[in-house]
Amino acid sequence: MNAAARVAREREEWEDVCALDDVLPGTGVCAMVAGQQVALVRTASPDALYAIGNFDPFSKAFVLSRGIVGDRAGVPKIASPIYKQSFDLRTGECLDDARVRVPTYDVRVEQGRILVYREPRRIGTR
């Protein structure tokens, strides 16, 4: 595969979902990525961007993008707006029940646009 074909294939694996400015620091928004609801979460301090599954396994609702963004002992997290369980934004692990986790996605910013990798990360990878 030549270099141009590799670049084209990689572009297909990433979905352009919105402008970085569409996600204010300290908030989340929902985006559709490869047919799945993904919560894009931007922390305020430090300014960082994360992508996790939007489905809250405790309330059985697609609400995590509307959660409370913050940190717990330095761990960036989002708390479900329903029952308040917190999820590590880096790993998807529930900070209140380590047996539960939500999918996480690679995310990057290019020319002011947020791109999300179409497949969730495998557990144990970054």
Question: Language-model segments: what does each one mean?
Answer:
Residues 1-75, 88-89, 101-126:
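N-terminal pre-ligand scaffold of iron-sulfur
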Residues 56, 80-83:
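Short cysteine clusters
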